Each structure stands twice: as C-alpha cells, then as structure tokens.
Amino acid sequence: MKLTCVLIISVLFLTASQLITAVYSRDKQQYRAARLRDEMRNLKGARDCGEQGQGCYTRPCCPGLECRGGGTGGGVCQQ
C-alpha cells in the first residue's frame, strides 16, 4: 500500500515536471526561431543585392549604387 502511494506520487510529480518543462521550452523555441531567422537575413551571402565595395558580376547592386569598372573580373558597386 505504501509502495503504491509512493509510486503514484512519483508518477504525478514526474508528469507535472515534464508538462512545465514542455510549456517553458515551447516559448523559448519560438523566440529562438525568430532570432535565427533574423540572423539568416543579416548574413552577407544571403542578400539579394551587392553593397558598396562588393562585386556586381553575379548579382545587381543595392538601390542607390551603380556597377562601375566592369573589366574582366566584373565591376564593383559604388555610389
């Protein structure tokens, strides 16, 4: 009888702690995903246009910049 009570209380305690942990980590994962998404957007290789001083041989320059010096190696984005 005592062993059964201890077992039931242990199972209830473990279940409650798992539920609390799952709810807590679900909120953390949501913020983590948003942070990773923002970091991916800020990577230089992930941008669709070349910034000032970057090459414009394979991709266009960002707005306000022009591709200049288009020799054999391609141009450079400049104002």
Curated annotation (Swiss-Prot):
Tissue: Expressed by the venom duct.
Signal peptide range in chain numbering: 1-22
Alphabetical UniProt keywords: Disulfide bond, Hydroxylation, Ion channel impairing toxin, Knottin, Secreted, Signal, Toxin
Propeptide stretch(es), residue numbers: 23-47
Any one of the GO CC terms: extracellular region
One of the record's GO molecular function terms: toxin activity
Role description: Ion channel inhibitor that inhibits the increase in intracellular calcium upon depolarization in DRG neurons. In vivo, both intraperitoneal and intracranial injections into mice induce hyperactivity.
Protein name: Conotoxin Tr6.2
Protein species of origin: Conus terebra
Taxonomic lineage: Eukaryota, Metazoa, Spiralia, Lophotrochozoa, Mollusca
